[in-house]
Design a protein with these regions (language model features):
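ABC ATPase C-loop
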Residues: 147-148
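The feature captures the beta-strand-to-loop junction immediately N-terminal to the Walker
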Residues: 33-35
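Helix-to-loop junction immediately C-terminal to a conserved catalytic motif
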Residues: 48
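Conserved ABC transporter NBD signature motif
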Residues: 56-64, 76, 109-115, 214
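Helical segment within the ABC ATPase nucleotide-binding domain
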Residues: 170-183
C-alpha cells in the first residue's frame, strides 16, 4: 500500500501541495482528478523522488521512502509513466521495452516478458519499428508496457488518455482493468477525462488548489458531484 501523510511542496513563494494525505490500496485503481494547475503532476514527481517533498511522509509497503532517490523507488517496485510518455524515439519498440528491465540483472533483462505483448499486441507487431515512428496512442501503449516490464507493484500513470484516439483509450482502459483484477498491484491514475476515470476508479480523490477537497468510492462519483468539480 502507498501511504501519503501531510505532504507539502513549494515552488518559490507558492505553496503547491498543501498537506495531502491519502492511501492507494493493492488491487485497486485510485483515480486522482483535478483541473489543470492544481498540483497533480507535482504530487507524482514527489512520489517518485524527482522533486523532494518539503514536509510530510511517503510510505510504500510499510517503509518510509520520503528520502529515497528515484532509482531506489524503482527498485522498490514503483513505476511511473509521465505525461508526454518520454519514450526513446530512436530506439526500437523492443529496445524501449528492454529499458524497462533495467532494475533486473543482465541475465533477467535479456528478453521482453511475454505478458507485455499479450496486453499490447500492437507492440509485438511493431517491435522492430522505431519508437518515434509510432502514433501517439501506440507510444502511450509503449510507455505503459515499458513501465510494466519492471514488474511494478505500484503503477503511477499521469493522464494516459491525453491526445489519444478513442479506440486506444478503450484498449488502455481494458489493460488497467486487467492489471487491477490481478490483485497484486496498486494503480494511481491521474486523469482529467472524467468518464474514463469514473469507469475505472475503485477510489477517487479530487484536488483543488493543492489540496484534496473530496474523496470517496468510485461507484459514488456521479452521485457525489465529482463531474462538476473537475469540469473545465
Amino acid at each position: 500500500m502507498l501511504q501519503v501523510e501531510q505532504l507539502h511542496q513549494y515552488y518559490g513563494g507558492s505553496h503547491i501541495l498543501r498537506g495531502l494525505s491519502f492511501e492507494a490500496t493493492v488491487g485497486e485503481v485510485t483515480c486522482l482528478l483535478g483541473r489543470n494547475g492544481v498540483g497533480k503532476t507535482t504530487l507524482l514527481k514527489c512520489l517518485m523522488g524527482l522533486v523532494p517533498a518539503k514536509e510530510g511522509k511517503v510510505s510504500w509497503e510499510g517503509k518510509a521512502i520520503t528520502a529515497s532517490r528515484p532509482h531506489q523507488r524503482v527498485q522498490a517496485g514503483i513505476a511511473y509513466v509521465p505525461q508526454g510518455r518520454e519514450i526513446f524515439p530512436r530506439l526500437t519498440v523492443e529496445e524501449n521495452l528492454l529499458m524497462g528491465l533495467s532494475r533486473f540483472s543482465a541475465k533477467e533483462a535479456k528478453e521482453v516478458p511475454g505478458f507485455i505483448y499479450e496486453l499490447f499486441p500492437v507492440l509485438l507487431e511493431m517491435k522492430h519499428r522505431r519508437g518515434g515512428d509510432l502514433s501517439g496512442g501506440q507510444q502511450q501503449q509503449l510507455a505503459i508496457g515499458r513501465a510494466l516490464a519492471s514488474r511494478p507493484r505500484l503503477l503511477i500513470l499521469d493522464e494516459p488518455t491525453e491526445g489519444i484516439q478513442p479506440s486506444v483509450i478503450k484498449e488502455i482502459g481494458a489493460v488497467i482493468r486487467k492489471l487491477a483484477a490481478r490483485g497484486d498491484m496498486s494503480i494511481l491514475l491521474v486523469e482529467q477525462f472524467y468518464d474514463f476515470a469514473a469507469e475505472l476508479a475503485d477510489q477517487y480523490l479530487v484536488m483543488a488548489r493543492g489540496e484534496i477537497v473530496q474523496q470517496g468510492r468510485g461507484a459514488d462519483m456521479e452521485a457525489e458531484g465529482v463531474r462538476g468539480l473537475v469540469a473545465i
